[in-house]
Amino acid sequence: MLDVNFFDELRIGLATADDIRRWSRGEVKKPETINYRTLKPEKDGLFCERIFGPTRDWECSCGKYKRVRYKGIICERCGVEVTKSKVRRERMGHIELAAPVTHIWYFKGVPSRLGYLLDLAPKDLEKIIYFAANIITSVDEDARHSDQTTLEAEMLLEKKEVEQDRDADLADRAKTLEEDLAELEAAGAKADAKKKVQNAADREMRHIRERAEREVERLDEIWNTFVKLAPKQMIADETLYEELLDRYEDYFTGGMGAEAIQTLIRNFDLEAEAESLREVIRDGKGQRKLRALKRLKVVAAFLRSGNDPAGMVLDCIPVIPPELRPMVQLDGGRFATSDLNDLYRRVINRNNRLKRMLDLGAPEIIVNNEKRMLQESVDALFDNGRRGRPVTGPGNRPLKSLSDLLKGKQGRFRQNLLGKRVDYSGRSVIIVGPQLKLHQCGLPKLMALELFKPFVMKRLVEKSYAQNIKSAKRMVERQRPEVWDVLEEAIAEHPVMLNRAPTLHRLGIQAFEPVLIEGKAIQLHPLACEAFNADFDGDQMAVHLPLSDEAQAEARILMLASNNILSPASGKPLAMPRLDMVTGLYYLTLIKGKEEFGGQGAFTEATEQGPATGVYTSLAEAIMAYDRGVLGLQAPIHVRIDHLRPPAEVEAEQFPDGWQKGQTWTAETTLGRVQFNELLPWNYPYVEGVMDKKNQAVVINDLAAKYPMITVAQTVDKLKDAGFYWATRSGVTITMHDVLVLPNKQEILDEYEAKAQRIEKKLARGKINESERYQSLVDLWKEATDFVGESVEKLYPDDNPIPMIVKSGAAGNMRQIWTLAGMKGMVTNSRGDYITRPVKTSFREGLSVLEYFNNSHGSRKGLADTALRTADSGYLTRRLVDVAQDVIVREDDCGTKQGVVLDVCTPVLDANGEKTGEFARADFVETSVLGRFLAADAIGANGEVVCEAGTVIGELELAELVKAGVETIKARSVMTCGTATGVCSTCYGKSMATGKKVEIGEAVGIVAAQSIGEPGTQLTMRTFHLGGVGGDITGGLPRVQELFEARVPKAKSPIASVDGKIKIEDDDAFFTLTIIPDDGSEEVVYEKLSKRQGLATLGTGGVERPLRDGDHVKMGQQLLKGAADPHEVLRVMGRRGVQQHLINEVQKVYRDQGVAIHDKHIEIIVRQMLRRVTVIDSGSTEYLPGSLVDHSDAVAASKEAVKTGGRPVEVRAEIMGITKASLATESWLSAASFQETTRVLTDAAINKRSDKLIGLKENVIIGKLIPAGTGIARYRNIQVQPTEEARAAAFTLPSTFGDGFYGDEGYGEFTGASVPLDDLGLH
């Protein structure tokens, strides 16, 4: 078998008949499979042992040779080679066909490759292949030309003969008529009798003339057809063809079926055809040119690849190894078999029958029918159902053909090659493990024992608990007490990987150090839940064990949970306190008055009556007061601190030279807040204030930016412990009694009900219409809901647990409290419109039957939406991964001078709109500017260089840029990166997950796809109704899909193609807009613009208004409401314009949902969408006009052409949707495993495509290490040099090398001496 590590590319091509015979070990001649009595394969059948190898290891079929000693011998009795039965997975056979057949992929695929090659319409081709029409394969032009006069004379003679016969017949008939009339005359017949005879004679004579005329016409047709006869001419009329064959068979050859096609292909001159097609392309126009271009693609593919086009017509077909199409016996003695065996059996039966008919010399019509059936059976074997009705098995189920085995989710690619199951894994339910450290997980003992079984067995033998592996295995299975101690050692410092499906981003798999626990559930650290999106309501997780030292090192260094605190999408920490922990820390840092519980012992000023109270000389003293019950946790106090750093302003004031540990300062704070600050690093400035979720996030973000990961991990762990501790002690729980109901709610609702009645009366009197009533009622009841809600909010005291949970940011929001205690308010129906009767009750009071019914519409739609969204989001992620999977950081710096211009800050204006000289951050700088390298010096407002080119922008640099008033910067971006495949580290910038410059080998494409796809489920499915807009404005997930697929939006808006003033003309149903360009060029007119869609709005000075006559518009500005078409944006604004448009539009959708994603992730996908260009003029290059090529390849080819004095290639930028871009990838393996498998493979085979194995998918498919991370080529040849201590420790193993390792008396006893490696040459 091939070793995947010994080849660098994989090529696919067309197999010729000789190739198929060379692969084969013998011909399958019989349709039989297994003898049902002996259960042995039939000789020459589909499972024949002589062809495919023995069914039992080292044993021939007849049993003459058994055992391995006869290896390689071929039995003279049964002809079976003595070898391993595994060869039945590799050895192929073949079927010699009695008549050639076409390969359905090349004939029936779209476009039909055979049709393009031979210039035949697919319909005509089908008629020929399936014996419904004849085709001329060759014509002897010279012979026809030289004999034409003779043949013409013969034809004229024949025509003359026909005419003479006609005349003779007519004369005879006329004579007979005269005689008949004379007889009647003599007999004195009446006139009508004579007339009858006359009419009959006339009719007969007319028939004679018509017959002769038809005969002459037929002869003319035969002659004209013969004179114009040309190769590839189809003759559908069977009798005409027979006549031609009778008369002129020496001058032409023809036929029907695949044989005729085979003859045409063999006579086909590819080079001459290519030349004539190029001529047509040069001189032709319109459809003719287009067809020539398409045909040239196919012809050039065969020329370039060296494939023999005859491979599209098969003389023999391969039979795949029997183990890949097995037949197994079921319990009842019946057999279950693969569908392929049925399909092969049909082919063999029909083939044998055809052979027999040919031997018997059967009539041509019967033979042709049998050939057609053979063709159909081969079609069904290759691709069942592609043409006509599929062949069905029992129960009318279509049989699975070879193509079906590759296609779809259950096909070979996605099911077996990209979705392998792995050993050393287990799964169980997860429960919370609050006592764990961030890098730990609790592993059930039984599961750990099974996972680490080989390691435990090895240790048991090493420690002499067991004599050999077999007894060690028995000990493990019986769970002897010694096993548990050994297991503890085996798992020490051996990380395991936990995974929760669905793995939406890379933090869905993380490594943890296992801690053995009782029970059968896996314990998960509470802070890891956010990344896994896990909760403890029955979720399950899988455990995987990294085996090799390299895998363990990767798991520990790269995947350990404590090293993966930041989100790769936005760079924000994910391991944050949540839920109970947030409530606990919020409670800890609250401040309470003296009279409240928890506020006792608060600070009071010194008076004449006595000294100040609530002042403490040290933290210890305050804690002692708290323990005695004198001081409350949340009471404001003054305390002297010397072990925590003071806030920045206190430090600046009291310690100008900087604070040192041990220096004291007085804090006005609470005991709880001091305890909170003790959880943070000692040199982090003291944090004062109530710590709700937002503030906690600010602190942790700050820590992540300024401290090493290990410190952050320890800090969040401490916060988790304190959070749980104080949440328990705060007594925050929810009971029915905590839900307070508004006492005067009924009165409020009665007021609004009266207003609603007034609106209904207005409708009845015709003062308002239906839509105005609807809008008025919706507004009224929304106002009522808000009023009730706000009243409820005021009703709750601060110490009520429900608002406490909401205010701390742990869970829920105020609107949920309104629903719980106020009123539910307006609900929607399944169409998304409001039901005008609101739900007036709260959940505390309970809903009435009608209210419950109304409410269930919207709830049901919500659930259905969620289900649809999950599937759609998953499919989007799959397409994104596919398009970006080969974007890997390949080099440190591509050296480009290009970059993108980004906004950093905006001037702050005063009330009069004048500049104040100060600057504020521009919107969204965190997701656009941070983490990038400067491509040019950043110049401040005063002209000084603030940051030089090549600086990476972090929080500090950003603050400097804003302070200096740098409004825009030019930064490096993946969209302008010069690296041919993948991107360079400098253009990508900092990795969001580490905060450092991205390393070479990082799979940034997949990280980008995951970052965009992972929040996809949170996006809404809804399309928004905007009043008066033609159709709906798409939003949420469908909008993201529309953008990435580069589709024309539903409510498409035209965009201004020039800068200029706008003139609006308004007729009944449409607008006509005219732009008068600033540069005085020709006016641009946009006609028939829908009024329903409405004019675009302009935002001026915070006020939005529609476009007006005389307004100035900029190039690229939308003229109507709706969305711009990306293809239009590309045409008007160019590549850079459309890139920015797509990024802004995608970000708009995510920002609406409050999801932070860095622009660079979207940039990577957009870069892949704009990678290809269309060749308009090929210049001096090899490209065909109209073909899609890689932009970087086109640039390289142009440079090469110009060097040699040629013309460069002329191209047009293209924007491709992600599905199309995935299928247009260089790698045919990756494209075939994505979608349209058969089409991709057909195309790849004709072009003899070579897969360079650059991306990730293609390497996974063939089983190689992926070329990313540590698997990239530059890291592959690293040698590890062990230290002497490591060598000694690693090799203290039982060994049989020479003396000295074992005592002389007890041979086989282990002495524990280390193996001297130097003598063995192992290093």
Swiss-Prot record:
Annotated keywords: DNA-directed RNA polymerase, Magnesium, Metal-binding, Nucleotidyltransferase, Transcription, Transferase, Zinc
How is its cofactor bound, per UniProt?
Answer: Binds 1 Mg(2+) ion per subunit. Binds 2 Zn(2+) ions per subunit.
Q: Where does Zn(2+) 1 bind?
A: C60, C62, C75, C78
List residues binding Mg(2+): D535, D537, D539
Molecular function (GO) terms listed?
DNA binding; DNA-directed RNA polymerase activity; magnesium ion binding; zinc ion binding
- The EC number(s) attached to this protein equal 2.7.7.6
UniProt-annotated binding residues for Zn(2+) 2: C894, C977, C984, C987
InterPro entries in the cross-refs: DNA-dir_RpoC_beta_prime, DNA-dir_RpoC_beta_prime_bact, RNA_pol_asu, RNA_pol_N, RNA_pol_Rpb1_1, RNA_pol_Rpb1_3, RNA_pol_Rpb1_3_sf, RNA_pol_Rpb1_4
Which reactions does this protein catalyse?
A: RNA(n) + a ribonucleoside 5'-triphosphate = RNA(n+1) + diphosphate
Task: Tell me its cofactors.
Answer: Mg(2+); Zn(2+)
Q: Name one GO biological process term.
A: DNA-templated transcription
Q: Which GO terms describe its cellular component?
A: DNA-directed RNA polymerase complex
Sequence similarity: Belongs to the RNA polymerase beta' chain family.
Function field: DNA-dependent RNA polymerase catalyzes the transcription of DNA into RNA using the four ribonucleoside triphosphates as substrates.
Subunit structure of this chain's protein? The RNAP catalytic core consists of 2 alpha, 1 beta, 1 beta' and 1 omega subunit. When a sigma factor is associated with the core the holoenzyme is formed, which can initiate transcription.
Name assigned to this protein: DNA-directed RNA polymerase subunit beta'
